[in-house]
């Protein structure tokens, strides 16, 4: 990345608590460059974060490179995931009996 002398600055942060049956629908993070999530609690059976390959719509006539346009990552407590904010993602229904807890944030170039 060419940051043109700027540095990533965290400009928003929030807590996500997903009880059993909770989910986050597919979304992107507007007005940000870099987004991420730190996992505080990820009990066994907690739902993954699922990223969608945005190139799929542009390759309708091309044969698929793999079976899915989705990439899932199972959260582990104490881990941090970061991605570019334009990347569409979601969290399917939490099937764990305990809460899935994370702290998410957005960064801009300051």
Please give the residue ranges for each predicted region.
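A short hydrophobic beta-strand segment most commonly corresponding to one strand
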Residues: 36-38, 97-110
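Catalytic core of non-heme Fe(II) oxygenases with the double-stranded beta-helix
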Residues: 9-82, 92
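Surface-exposed helix-capping loop/turn segments at secondary-structure junctions
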Residues: 1-7
């Amino acid at each position: 990345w060419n940051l043109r002398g700027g540095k990533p600055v965290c400009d928003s942060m929030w807590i996500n608590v997903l009880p059993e049956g909770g989910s986050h629908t597919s979304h992107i993070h507007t007005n940000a460059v870099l987004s991420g999530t730190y996992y505080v609690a990820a009990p066994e059976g907690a739902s993954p974060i699922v990223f969608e390959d945005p190139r799929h719509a542009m390759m309708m006539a091309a044969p698929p490179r793999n079976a899915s346009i989705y990439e899932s990552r199972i959260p582990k407590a104490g881990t941090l995931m970061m991605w570019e904010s334009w990347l569409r993602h979601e969290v399917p229904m939490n099937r764990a009996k305990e809460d899935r807890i994370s702290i998410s944030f957005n960064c801009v170039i300051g």
